[in-house]
Amino acid sequence: MANGPTHQFLIFKIIPIDIGGIDFSFTNASLFMVASAVLSAGFLYFATSARSVIPGRSQSVAEMAYEFIASMLKEGAGTKGMKFFPLVFSLFMFVLTANLLGMVPYFYTVTSQIIVTFALALLVILTVILYGFIKHGFGFLKLFVPQGVPGILLPLVVIIEIISFLSRPISLSVRLFANMLAGHITLKVFAGFVASLGTLGALGIGGAILPLIMTVALTGLEFLVAFLQAYVFAVLTCMYLNDAVHPGGH
């Protein structure tokens, strides 16, 4: 159905590119990923390019975002984890900007695509693994051996810990993807009710009031969810990075 609630998630090619039978086309999803990266980086650049003792609104927002992520990273991974600040801050700003762009009518929500969120989650986990082995060598494997576990239970616990670790990119990506997908589908459904009832005359307009109120309320809620999901993604990233910095800390 062309105007169905899932139509907004369709991917179409803007610039078809085929190399050796592999599709590298530039799509609407690609466009909004680039837009999210450029807008977030551009905002931070212009907000901090003319720094002053008494900050303006844009500089205040940029500084609040910086302090917010810095505090989160220190709490989640300690002072040694601050070396990962550029990664966590970039991920937070990208996800937040992508989520907010998706709230604009007719714009594409790239975080509603599991392949996008999984790529971001995979980047986090690969960073944890690479840094863990580079910094600690095989000592990184202490991560899978919790302290205080009886020897008879250790093999089972190690298997559970490994499975839990490998499932992290799945849970991290699905959480973001599912929340954005479900929220936008719900908004589309209620907005569709309003549009359909509005065509039925006076009676329909009266019946459209409740769905309209619900749509406005859900829109406000989705803006909150857009921030919360970026926050949750960043918090979990900090927790996972803590395992790379302190593999024997649990």
Swiss-Prot record:
A GO cellular-component term linked to this record: proton-transporting ATP synthase complex
Source organism superkingdom: Bacteria
Membrane topology summary: Multi-pass membrane protein
InterPro entries registered for this protein in UniProt: ATP_synth_F0_asu (IPR000568), ATP_synth_F0_asu_AS (IPR023011), ATP_synth_F0_asu_bact/mt (IPR045083), F0_ATP_A_sf (IPR035908)
A single MF term (Gene Ontology): proton-transporting ATP synthase activity, rotational mechanism
Transmembrane segments annotated in the record for this chain: 29-49, 84-104, 114-134, 143-163, 185-205, 208-228
CDD domains: ATP-synt_Fo_a_6
SUPFAM superfamilies: F1F0 ATP synthase subunit A
Keywords: ATP synthesis, Cell inner membrane, Cell membrane, CF(0), Hydrogen ion transport, Ion transport, Membrane, Transmembrane, Transmembrane helix, Transport
Subcellular location: Cell inner membrane
Chief location of this protein within or outside the cell: membrane
Known function: Key component of the proton channel; it plays a direct role in the translocation of protons across the membrane.
Subunit and partners: F-type ATPases have 2 components, CF(1) - the catalytic core - and CF(0) - the membrane proton channel. CF(1) has five subunits: alpha(3), beta(3), gamma(1), delta(1), epsilon(1). CF(0) has three main subunits: a(1), b(2) and c(9-12). The alpha and beta chains form an alternating ring which encloses part of the gamma chain. CF(1) is attached to CF(0) by a central stalk formed by the gamma and epsilon chains, while a peripheral stalk is formed by the delta and b chains.
Family under the similarity heading: Belongs to the ATPase A chain family.
The protein's name in its UniProt record: ATP synthase subunit a
